[in-house]
């Protein structure tokens, strides 16, 4: 069984809630998902819901409340206790910080410092029995500061690509089928910059599969 462990920030929920829902509902017996929800994530989503009337944030909070549903058999969710942040020293974060990085970690606002604390806790301090945790974020600044502190991070698209393959997702199967058809009907060549390209005959054009339905017309 393959296991994936993700720390999820607010931007991942707000911009990729549909993807996260699909991961949970499509999770097969061959894949186990562990989600860690930091205090930062809950506070940010609550702020976006209350102050900016974000529909995505509101739906994300509702979804998080339902994640302990028994129908998500291969999913484990860990909601961070705020008290955890009090036991993590800032020096623990700075120990992993690359001082040559672009971001002055010491001058970050407290909420971002708390996110770093949560990530350092899961990645390095907690007894994880060999588990490797990855931060999912759609915020370039957060991914940059995570990289500077040696915290593995990725985007929704990155995770989607990996999980679609492991869960044998329909979109992955169709994409793989399309790629195989391209290889069959084309010729592999190498471009001037060293990239591999597939050259096809116009008369053997292959179109990617589309969903069923009627073509809309005005």
Curated annotation (Swiss-Prot):
The keyword Cytoplasm applies. GO terms for cellular component: cytoplasm; nucleus. Coiled coil: none annotated. Keywords: Cytoplasm, Nonsense-mediated mRNA decay. It comes from the Eukaryota. Its main location: cytoplasm. One of its GO terms (biological process) is nuclear-transcribed mRNA catabolic process, nonsense-mediated decay. InterPro entries: PIN_dom. It is found in: Cytoplasm. Present with 6090 molecules/cell in log phase SD medium. Involved in nonsense-mediated decay of mRNAs containing premature stop codons. This is Nonsense-mediated decay protein 4. It comes from Saccharomyces cerevisiae (strain ATCC 204508 / S288c). The gene is NMD4.
